[in-house]
Swiss-Prot record:
Domain F-box span(s) in chain numbering: 412-458
Domain of life of the native organism: Eukaryota
Keyword Coiled coil: yes
UniProt KW Coiled coil keyword: yes
Organism of derivation: Arabidopsis thaliana (Mouse-ear cress)
This protein's name: Probable F-box protein At5g25300
Protein backbone atom coordinates (compact mmCIF):
# COMPACT_ATOMS: atom_id res chain seq x y z
CA UNK A 1 0.00 0.00 0.00
CA UNK A 2 1.37 3.38 -0.99
CA UNK A 3 1.72 5.95 1.74
CA UNK A 4 0.10 9.25 0.96
CA UNK A 5 1.28 12.65 2.08
CA UNK A 6 0.08 12.98 5.68
CA UNK A 7 -0.18 16.75 5.34
CA UNK A 8 -2.92 16.50 2.73
CA UNK A 9 -6.55 15.83 3.48
CA UNK A 10 -7.74 14.10 0.35
CA UNK A 11 -7.50 14.07 -3.42
CA UNK A 12 -11.20 14.95 -3.58
CA UNK A 13 -12.13 18.55 -4.45
CA UNK A 14 -13.14 20.84 -1.64
CA UNK A 15 -16.79 21.08 -2.67
CA UNK A 16 -17.16 17.30 -2.59
CA UNK A 17 -15.61 17.16 0.87
CA UNK A 18 -17.87 19.94 2.00
CA UNK A 19 -20.95 18.16 0.66
CA UNK A 20 -19.92 14.95 2.38
CA UNK A 21 -18.87 16.25 5.74
CA UNK A 22 -20.64 19.52 6.49
CA UNK A 23 -23.49 17.75 8.30
CA UNK A 24 -23.59 18.44 12.02
CA UNK A 25 -23.79 15.43 14.27
CA UNK A 26 -26.28 14.31 16.83
CA UNK A 27 -27.35 11.38 18.95
CA UNK A 28 -30.74 10.08 20.04
CA UNK A 29 -31.19 7.46 22.74
CA UNK A 30 -34.14 5.07 22.48
CA UNK A 31 -35.37 3.08 25.48
CA UNK A 32 -37.55 0.15 24.34
CA UNK A 33 -38.92 -0.42 27.85
CA UNK A 34 -40.48 3.04 27.87
CA UNK A 35 -40.99 3.28 24.08
CA UNK A 36 -39.47 6.76 24.26
CA UNK A 37 -36.49 8.43 22.69
CA UNK A 38 -34.28 11.07 24.24
CA UNK A 39 -31.95 13.57 22.68
CA UNK A 40 -28.74 14.10 24.59
CA UNK A 41 -27.65 17.59 25.60
CA UNK A 42 -24.04 16.87 24.72
CA UNK A 43 -22.81 18.41 21.47
CA UNK A 44 -21.86 15.44 19.29
CA UNK A 45 -20.97 17.32 16.12
CA UNK A 46 -17.64 16.39 14.58
CA UNK A 47 -17.38 12.99 16.28
CA UNK A 48 -18.19 9.42 15.31
CA UNK A 49 -19.71 6.82 17.61
CA UNK A 50 -17.69 3.62 17.23
CA UNK A 51 -18.89 1.31 20.00
CA UNK A 52 -20.73 1.36 23.28
CA UNK A 53 -21.28 -0.47 26.54
CA UNK A 54 -24.63 0.64 27.98
CA UNK A 55 -24.32 4.43 28.42
CA UNK A 56 -20.56 4.65 27.78
CA UNK A 57 -19.63 5.36 24.15
CA UNK A 58 -16.30 5.12 22.38
CA UNK A 59 -15.93 8.06 19.98
CA UNK A 60 -13.40 9.35 17.47
CA UNK A 61 -13.10 13.01 16.51
CA UNK A 62 -11.76 14.65 13.36
CA UNK A 63 -8.26 14.94 14.87
CA UNK A 64 -8.13 11.16 15.36
CA UNK A 65 -8.49 11.50 19.14
CA UNK A 66 -10.13 8.61 20.96
CA UNK A 67 -12.11 9.04 24.15
CA UNK A 68 -15.07 7.61 26.06
CA UNK A 69 -18.10 9.69 26.99
CA UNK A 70 -21.20 9.15 29.10
CA UNK A 71 -24.10 10.27 26.91
CA UNK A 72 -26.26 11.00 29.97
CA UNK A 73 -23.78 13.36 31.57
CA UNK A 74 -20.69 15.44 30.84
CA UNK A 75 -18.31 12.71 31.98
CA UNK A 76 -15.42 12.07 29.62
CA UNK A 77 -12.45 9.69 29.71
CA UNK A 78 -9.53 10.60 27.45
CA UNK A 79 -7.71 7.71 25.80
CA UNK A 80 -4.06 7.72 24.74
CA UNK A 81 -3.36 9.03 21.22
CA UNK A 82 -3.08 6.46 18.47
CA UNK A 83 0.62 7.16 17.98
CA UNK A 84 1.42 6.30 21.64
CA UNK A 85 1.94 2.59 20.97
CA UNK A 86 4.87 1.19 22.94
CA UNK A 87 6.45 -2.20 22.50
CA UNK A 88 6.69 -4.75 25.28
CA UNK A 89 4.54 -5.62 28.26
CA UNK A 90 4.13 -3.35 31.26
CA UNK A 91 2.70 -3.76 34.72
CA UNK A 92 -0.71 -2.33 35.53
CA UNK A 93 -1.74 -0.53 38.68
CA UNK A 94 -4.54 -2.24 40.61
CA UNK A 95 -7.88 -0.95 39.32
CA UNK A 96 -10.37 -2.99 41.35
CA UNK A 97 -12.00 -0.03 43.09
CA UNK A 98 -15.78 -0.36 42.72
CA UNK A 99 -16.13 3.40 42.31
CA UNK A 100 -14.00 3.33 39.18
CA UNK A 101 -15.33 2.52 35.73
CA UNK A 102 -13.09 -0.15 34.25
CA UNK A 103 -12.71 -0.45 30.50
CA UNK A 104 -10.56 -1.97 27.83
CA UNK A 105 -10.14 -0.84 24.22
CA UNK A 106 -8.73 -3.15 21.55
CA UNK A 107 -8.06 -2.17 17.94
CA UNK A 108 -6.07 -2.93 14.82
CA UNK A 109 -5.58 -1.02 11.58
CA UNK A 110 -5.46 -3.71 8.93
CA UNK A 111 -5.57 -7.47 8.61
CA UNK A 112 -1.96 -7.39 7.45
CA UNK A 113 -0.77 -5.65 10.61
CA UNK A 114 1.88 -7.14 12.90
CA UNK A 115 0.17 -6.29 16.18
CA UNK A 116 -3.11 -5.58 17.94
CA UNK A 117 -3.16 -2.60 20.31
CA UNK A 118 -5.03 -2.48 23.61
CA UNK A 119 -5.38 -0.09 26.52
CA UNK A 120 -7.00 -0.25 29.96
CA UNK A 121 -8.09 2.48 32.31
CA UNK A 122 -5.19 4.12 34.11
CA UNK A 123 -2.75 3.69 31.20
CA UNK A 124 -1.32 6.54 29.14
CA UNK A 125 -0.30 4.47 26.11
CA UNK A 126 -1.33 1.44 24.11
CA UNK A 127 0.38 -1.91 24.49
CA UNK A 128 0.70 -4.29 21.60
CA UNK A 129 -0.21 -7.94 21.15
CA UNK A 130 2.13 -9.46 18.53
CA UNK A 131 0.42 -11.60 15.93
CA UNK A 132 3.42 -12.30 13.66
CA UNK A 133 6.72 -12.05 15.53
CA UNK A 134 7.51 -14.24 18.56
CA UNK A 135 4.30 -16.21 17.99
CA UNK A 136 4.07 -19.87 17.03
CA UNK A 137 3.19 -20.54 13.42
CA UNK A 138 -0.30 -21.86 14.20
CA UNK A 139 -1.27 -18.63 15.99
CA UNK A 140 0.09 -16.09 13.51
CA UNK A 141 -1.90 -13.61 11.42
CA UNK A 142 -5.41 -12.27 11.93
CA UNK A 143 -8.74 -12.79 10.20
CA UNK A 144 -11.40 -11.65 12.66
CA UNK A 145 -11.52 -10.45 16.27
CA UNK A 146 -14.13 -10.42 19.04
CA UNK A 147 -13.85 -8.98 22.55
CA UNK A 148 -16.29 -10.66 24.92
CA UNK A 149 -17.00 -10.46 28.62
CA UNK A 150 -14.47 -7.72 29.30
CA UNK A 151 -11.39 -9.96 29.62
CA UNK A 152 -11.54 -12.51 26.79
CA UNK A 153 -10.28 -11.72 23.30
CA UNK A 154 -10.92 -14.20 20.49
CA UNK A 155 -8.80 -13.89 17.35
CA UNK A 156 -9.53 -16.03 14.32
CA UNK A 157 -6.41 -16.89 12.35
CA UNK A 158 -5.87 -17.36 8.66
CA UNK A 159 -4.43 -20.80 9.46
CA UNK A 160 -7.83 -22.20 10.43
CA UNK A 161 -7.71 -21.74 14.18
CA UNK A 162 -8.91 -19.36 16.86
CA UNK A 163 -6.54 -17.86 19.40
CA UNK A 164 -7.93 -16.93 22.79
CA UNK A 165 -6.32 -14.30 25.02
CA UNK A 166 -7.27 -13.42 28.55
CA UNK A 167 -6.56 -9.98 30.00
CA UNK A 168 -5.31 -9.57 33.57
CA UNK A 169 -4.77 -6.47 35.65
CA UNK A 170 -1.05 -6.92 36.30
CA UNK A 171 0.19 -9.40 33.70
CA UNK A 172 -1.46 -7.60 30.78
CA UNK A 173 -2.60 -10.67 28.83
CA UNK A 174 -1.80 -14.35 28.42
CA UNK A 175 -2.59 -16.99 25.83
CA UNK A 176 -4.94 -19.64 27.13
CA UNK A 177 -4.13 -23.34 26.92
CA UNK A 178 -4.20 -24.87 23.44
CA UNK A 179 -7.12 -27.07 24.47
CA UNK A 180 -9.40 -24.07 24.06
CA UNK A 181 -8.34 -23.41 20.48
CA UNK A 182 -11.25 -23.77 18.08
CA UNK A 183 -10.07 -24.73 14.58
CA UNK A 184 -11.77 -23.56 11.43
CA UNK A 185 -13.92 -26.04 9.61
CA UNK A 186 -12.22 -26.83 6.33
CA UNK A 187 -14.30 -26.41 3.19
CA UNK A 188 -14.99 -29.87 1.75
CA UNK A 189 -16.46 -28.53 -1.47
CA UNK A 190 -16.16 -25.48 -3.66
CA UNK A 191 -18.59 -24.11 -6.23
CA UNK A 192 -17.47 -21.73 -8.95
CA UNK A 193 -18.49 -18.18 -8.13
CA UNK A 194 -18.89 -18.88 -4.40
CA UNK A 195 -17.12 -16.94 -1.69
CA UNK A 196 -16.95 -17.87 1.97
CA UNK A 197 -15.82 -16.33 5.22
CA UNK A 198 -15.27 -17.56 8.77
CA UNK A 199 -16.34 -15.44 11.72
CA UNK A 200 -16.46 -15.84 15.49
CA UNK A 201 -19.59 -15.73 17.62
CA UNK A 202 -19.91 -16.10 21.39
CA UNK A 203 -23.21 -17.06 23.01
CA UNK A 204 -24.58 -15.60 26.24
CA UNK A 205 -23.22 -18.71 28.01
CA UNK A 206 -19.75 -17.90 26.54
CA UNK A 207 -19.70 -20.84 24.17
CA UNK A 208 -17.54 -20.09 21.14
CA UNK A 209 -19.11 -20.79 17.75
CA UNK A 210 -17.72 -20.68 14.25
CA UNK A 211 -20.01 -19.06 11.67
CA UNK A 212 -19.22 -20.06 8.10
CA UNK A 213 -20.86 -17.83 5.48
CA UNK A 214 -21.25 -18.65 1.80
CA UNK A 215 -22.14 -16.20 -0.96
CA UNK A 216 -22.75 -17.19 -4.58
CA UNK A 217 -21.99 -14.46 -7.09
CA UNK A 218 -24.13 -15.78 -9.95
CA UNK A 219 -27.37 -16.35 -8.01
CA UNK A 220 -26.80 -13.76 -5.20
CA UNK A 221 -27.67 -16.61 -2.83
CA UNK A 222 -26.41 -16.78 0.75
CA UNK A 223 -26.13 -19.59 3.25
CA UNK A 224 -24.37 -20.19 6.54
CA UNK A 225 -23.36 -22.98 8.88
CA UNK A 226 -22.71 -23.02 12.61
CA UNK A 227 -20.08 -25.18 14.29
CA UNK A 228 -18.92 -25.72 17.84
CA UNK A 229 -16.23 -27.79 19.49
CA UNK A 230 -17.25 -31.44 19.79
CA UNK A 231 -17.88 -32.07 23.54
CA UNK A 232 -17.60 -35.87 23.12
CA UNK A 233 -15.07 -36.54 20.38
CA UNK A 234 -14.19 -39.97 19.07
CA UNK A 235 -10.73 -40.81 20.41
CA UNK A 236 -9.78 -42.58 17.19
CA UNK A 237 -10.86 -39.60 15.11
CA UNK A 238 -8.76 -37.18 17.16
CA UNK A 239 -5.56 -38.78 15.89
CA UNK A 240 -5.87 -36.98 12.56
CA UNK A 241 -8.04 -34.14 13.87
CA UNK A 242 -7.09 -33.13 17.44
CA UNK A 243 -9.84 -30.49 17.57
CA UNK A 244 -13.00 -32.06 16.12
CA UNK A 245 -16.05 -29.91 15.56
CA UNK A 246 -19.73 -30.69 15.27
CA UNK A 247 -22.22 -28.85 13.06
CA UNK A 248 -25.00 -27.21 15.04
CA UNK A 249 -27.21 -26.25 12.14
CA UNK A 250 -27.15 -24.93 8.62
CA UNK A 251 -29.26 -22.50 6.67
CA UNK A 252 -29.30 -22.17 2.91
CA UNK A 253 -29.28 -25.86 1.89
CA UNK A 254 -31.64 -28.47 3.38
CA UNK A 255 -32.93 -26.31 6.21
CA UNK A 256 -33.74 -23.36 3.98
CA UNK A 257 -36.87 -24.69 2.30
CA UNK A 258 -39.29 -21.84 1.86
CA UNK A 259 -36.54 -19.23 1.89
CA UNK A 260 -34.66 -20.11 -1.27
CA UNK A 261 -37.52 -19.83 -3.76
CA UNK A 262 -37.62 -16.07 -3.87
CA UNK A 263 -37.66 -14.71 -7.41
CA UNK A 264 -37.15 -11.05 -6.64
CA UNK A 265 -34.00 -9.53 -5.27
CA UNK A 266 -34.48 -7.80 -1.93
CA UNK A 267 -32.79 -7.52 1.42
CA UNK A 268 -33.79 -9.89 4.23
CA UNK A 269 -33.69 -8.84 7.86
CA UNK A 270 -33.85 -12.02 9.92
CA UNK A 271 -33.01 -13.40 13.34
CA UNK A 272 -31.92 -17.02 13.77
CA UNK A 273 -32.77 -18.71 17.08
CA UNK A 274 -30.13 -21.24 18.13
CA UNK A 275 -32.55 -23.01 20.49
CA UNK A 276 -35.53 -23.48 18.18
CA UNK A 277 -33.42 -23.63 14.98
CA UNK A 278 -35.93 -21.31 13.35
CA UNK A 279 -35.45 -18.21 11.27
CA UNK A 280 -37.64 -15.22 12.03
CA UNK A 281 -38.07 -12.77 9.18
CA UNK A 282 -39.09 -9.12 9.44
CA UNK A 283 -40.78 -8.34 6.11
CA UNK A 284 -41.38 -4.70 6.98
CA UNK A 285 -37.63 -4.13 7.02
CA UNK A 286 -36.86 -6.04 3.82
CA UNK A 287 -37.94 -3.45 1.26
CA UNK A 288 -36.12 -0.48 2.75
CA UNK A 289 -33.40 1.33 0.85
CA UNK A 290 -30.97 0.75 3.67
CA UNK A 291 -27.76 2.67 4.06
CA UNK A 292 -26.78 1.29 7.45
CA UNK A 293 -28.04 -1.08 10.12
CA UNK A 294 -26.84 -1.99 13.58
CA UNK A 295 -28.04 -4.87 15.72
CA UNK A 296 -27.76 -4.63 19.49
CA UNK A 297 -28.12 -7.05 22.37
CA UNK A 298 -28.92 -5.75 25.83
CA UNK A 299 -29.44 -7.62 29.07
CA UNK A 300 -31.30 -7.15 32.33
CA UNK A 301 -30.45 -9.98 34.70
CA UNK A 302 -31.07 -13.20 32.79
CA UNK A 303 -33.32 -11.51 30.21
CA UNK A 304 -31.81 -10.60 26.85
CA UNK A 305 -33.34 -8.22 24.34
CA UNK A 306 -32.40 -8.28 20.65
CA UNK A 307 -33.03 -5.16 18.64
CA UNK A 308 -32.11 -3.66 15.31
CA UNK A 309 -31.69 -0.11 14.10
CA UNK A 310 -31.93 0.50 10.36
CA UNK A 311 -31.73 3.63 8.24
CA UNK A 312 -33.49 4.44 4.99
CA UNK A 313 -32.96 7.41 2.70
CA UNK A 314 -36.36 8.89 1.85
CA UNK A 315 -35.02 11.53 -0.52
CA UNK A 316 -32.02 13.84 -0.71
CA UNK A 317 -33.17 15.76 2.35
CA UNK A 318 -34.42 13.27 4.92
CA UNK A 319 -33.26 10.03 6.44
CA UNK A 320 -35.61 7.76 8.34
CA UNK A 321 -34.39 5.52 11.14
CA UNK A 322 -36.49 2.62 12.38
CA UNK A 323 -36.07 0.77 15.63
CA UNK A 324 -37.57 -2.73 15.77
CA UNK A 325 -37.77 -5.01 18.81
CA UNK A 326 -36.90 -8.44 17.41
CA UNK A 327 -38.36 -10.26 20.41
CA UNK A 328 -41.78 -8.68 20.03
CA UNK A 329 -44.41 -10.66 18.17
CA UNK A 330 -45.98 -7.48 16.85
CA UNK A 331 -42.59 -6.25 15.59
CA UNK A 332 -43.71 -2.73 16.40
CA UNK A 333 -41.36 -0.16 14.97
CA UNK A 334 -40.40 3.24 16.29
CA UNK A 335 -39.67 5.73 13.53
CA UNK A 336 -37.48 8.80 13.70
CA UNK A 337 -37.15 11.14 10.76
CA UNK A 338 -33.86 13.05 10.49
CA UNK A 339 -32.94 16.02 8.37
CA UNK A 340 -29.80 15.41 6.33
CA UNK A 341 -29.24 19.15 6.01
CA UNK A 342 -29.98 20.18 9.60
CA UNK A 343 -29.42 18.59 12.98
CA UNK A 344 -33.12 18.06 13.51
CA UNK A 345 -35.33 15.04 13.96
CA UNK A 346 -39.04 14.41 14.38
CA UNK A 347 -40.68 11.66 16.41
CA UNK A 348 -42.85 9.85 13.85
CA UNK A 349 -44.88 8.19 16.61
CA UNK A 350 -46.44 11.42 17.85
CA UNK A 351 -49.95 12.14 16.58
CA UNK A 352 -49.28 15.81 15.88
CA UNK A 353 -45.87 15.23 14.29
CA UNK A 354 -47.06 15.46 10.67
CA UNK A 355 -47.65 19.21 10.92
CA UNK A 356 -44.16 19.66 12.32
CA UNK A 357 -42.73 17.45 9.58
CA UNK A 358 -44.43 19.49 6.85
CA UNK A 359 -43.13 22.74 8.33
CA UNK A 360 -39.59 21.40 8.51
CA UNK A 361 -39.79 20.02 4.96
CA UNK A 362 -40.94 23.41 3.65
CA UNK A 363 -38.14 25.20 5.47
CA UNK A 364 -35.46 22.79 4.30
CA UNK A 365 -36.77 22.81 0.72
CA UNK A 366 -36.36 26.58 0.63
CA UNK A 367 -32.78 26.30 1.81
CA UNK A 368 -32.09 23.40 -0.52
CA UNK A 369 -33.32 25.34 -3.60
CA UNK A 370 -30.74 28.10 -3.34
CA UNK A 371 -29.06 29.07 -6.57
CA UNK A 372 -25.83 27.42 -7.65
CA UNK A 373 -24.05 30.76 -7.39
CA UNK A 374 -25.02 31.14 -3.73
CA UNK A 375 -23.95 27.59 -3.02
CA UNK A 376 -20.59 28.19 -4.70
CA UNK A 377 -19.96 31.33 -2.63
CA UNK A 378 -20.81 29.46 0.54
CA UNK A 379 -18.38 26.69 -0.33
CA UNK A 380 -15.62 29.18 -1.06
CA UNK A 381 -15.99 30.61 2.46
CA UNK A 382 -14.29 27.62 4.04
CA UNK A 383 -11.50 28.53 6.43
CA UNK A 384 -8.77 26.67 8.24
CA UNK A 385 -10.99 26.32 11.30
CA UNK A 386 -13.58 24.51 9.21
CA UNK A 387 -10.90 22.23 7.84
CA UNK A 388 -9.95 21.22 11.35
CA UNK A 389 -13.46 19.82 11.82
CA UNK A 390 -13.50 17.80 8.61
CA UNK A 391 -12.57 14.17 8.23
CA UNK A 392 -10.69 12.76 5.26
CA UNK A 393 -12.77 10.65 2.92
CA UNK A 394 -9.65 8.64 2.05
CA UNK A 395 -9.73 5.34 0.24
CA UNK A 396 -9.23 4.83 -3.46
CA UNK A 397 -12.08 7.07 -4.54
CA UNK A 398 -12.86 7.48 -8.22
CA UNK A 399 -14.60 10.77 -8.94
CA UNK A 400 -16.13 11.77 -12.27
CA UNK A 401 -17.87 14.86 -13.67
CA UNK A 402 -16.49 17.28 -11.08
CA UNK A 403 -17.48 20.94 -11.19
CA UNK A 404 -14.06 22.62 -10.94
CA UNK A 405 -15.62 26.07 -10.51
CA UNK A 406 -16.60 25.23 -6.94
CA UNK A 407 -13.16 24.22 -5.72
CA UNK A 408 -11.70 26.00 -2.72
CA UNK A 409 -7.95 26.50 -2.21
CA UNK A 410 -6.41 23.99 0.17
CA UNK A 411 -5.95 25.98 3.38
CA UNK A 412 -5.60 23.05 5.74
CA UNK A 413 -2.54 22.78 7.96
CA UNK A 414 -0.86 19.42 8.61
CA UNK A 415 -3.52 17.70 10.68
CA UNK A 416 -1.69 14.66 12.04
CA UNK A 417 1.73 13.10 12.34
CA UNK A 418 0.35 9.64 11.58
CA UNK A 419 1.43 8.03 8.28
CA UNK A 420 -0.91 8.59 5.39
CA UNK A 421 -1.84 4.93 4.98
CA UNK A 422 -2.92 4.75 8.64
CA UNK A 423 -4.99 7.92 8.28
CA UNK A 424 -6.61 6.52 5.19
CA UNK A 425 -7.43 3.30 7.03
CA UNK A 426 -8.90 5.21 9.95
CA UNK A 427 -11.14 7.58 8.02
CA UNK A 428 -11.96 5.83 4.76
CA UNK A 429 -15.27 4.51 6.12
CA UNK A 430 -17.99 7.13 5.86
CA UNK A 431 -21.07 7.26 8.04
CA UNK A 432 -24.29 6.25 6.36
CA UNK A 433 -25.60 9.80 5.90
CA UNK A 434 -22.38 11.14 4.42
CA UNK A 435 -21.89 8.21 2.07
CA UNK A 436 -25.43 8.51 0.72
CA UNK A 437 -24.86 12.20 0.04
CA UNK A 438 -21.61 11.33 -1.69
CA UNK A 439 -23.41 9.02 -4.08
CA UNK A 440 -25.88 11.78 -4.89
CA UNK A 441 -23.08 14.23 -5.60
CA UNK A 442 -20.92 12.07 -7.86
CA UNK A 443 -20.04 8.42 -8.46
CA UNK A 444 -17.63 7.28 -5.75
CA UNK A 445 -16.23 3.78 -5.37
CA UNK A 446 -15.51 2.82 -1.78
CA UNK A 447 -12.14 1.29 -1.04
CA UNK A 448 -12.13 -2.40 -0.13
CA UNK A 449 -9.23 -2.10 2.31
CA UNK A 450 -9.89 -2.35 6.02
CA UNK A 451 -10.66 0.50 8.34
CA UNK A 452 -9.96 0.97 12.01
CA UNK A 453 -11.90 -1.47 14.16
CA UNK A 454 -12.51 -0.80 17.82
CA UNK A 455 -14.29 -2.60 20.60
CA UNK A 456 -15.28 -1.28 24.01
CA UNK A 457 -16.32 -3.57 26.83
CA UNK A 458 -17.04 -2.28 30.33
CA UNK A 459 -16.62 -5.02 32.90
CA UNK A 460 -17.04 -3.23 36.21
CA UNK A 461 -19.17 -0.65 37.96
CA UNK A 462 -22.13 -0.48 35.56
CA UNK A 463 -24.17 -3.44 36.73
CA UNK A 464 -25.51 -1.39 39.65
CA UNK A 465 -26.93 1.39 37.47
CA UNK A 466 -30.74 1.01 37.23
CA UNK A 467 -32.89 1.22 34.10
CA UNK A 468 -29.96 1.37 31.69
CA UNK A 469 -29.66 -2.25 30.66
CA UNK A 470 -32.14 -1.92 27.80
CA UNK A 471 -30.96 1.37 26.31
CA UNK A 472 -30.04 1.27 22.63
CA UNK A 473 -28.61 4.15 20.64
CA UNK A 474 -28.97 5.84 17.29
CA UNK A 475 -26.16 8.00 15.97
CA UNK A 476 -25.52 9.98 12.86
CA UNK A 477 -22.91 12.43 11.65
Amino acid sequence: MDTTNSSRWSELPIDILRSLLEQKGGCAIYNPDEAKDYKTKRDSSGIRFLANSVNWFLVLDSRSNLYIIDVFSEKKIDLPPLESIKNGLYSLEQVGDEKKKEYIVVWFFDKGTEYIAFCKNGEDHYRDIPIRKNVCKELQDLYDMLLHGGNNLYISKTRQSIRKLRFFEEEGFIDVDNSEILPFRKISFYIDGARFSNNIAVTTSREVLLVQNFFYETTRYRSFRLYKKDPNPDLNATINNPYPMVELCSLGDVSASGFGDRKRSCLDMCMFNLVTKKLKRFPDLSNLKLTDARCTTTSSGNNWKFSIIVSEVIDSKFLELRFADLDSESQQQTKLKFSMLKSEFVDMNKEDSQIEINEKETKINQEHDQSDETQAKRRRSLTSSVWQDLVSVGGEANVKEIDRSMETPNSSPPWSELPGDILRSVFERLSFVDFQRAKQTCPIKRSKSNCLRLWLITFGGLERLPHLSSVCFISWT
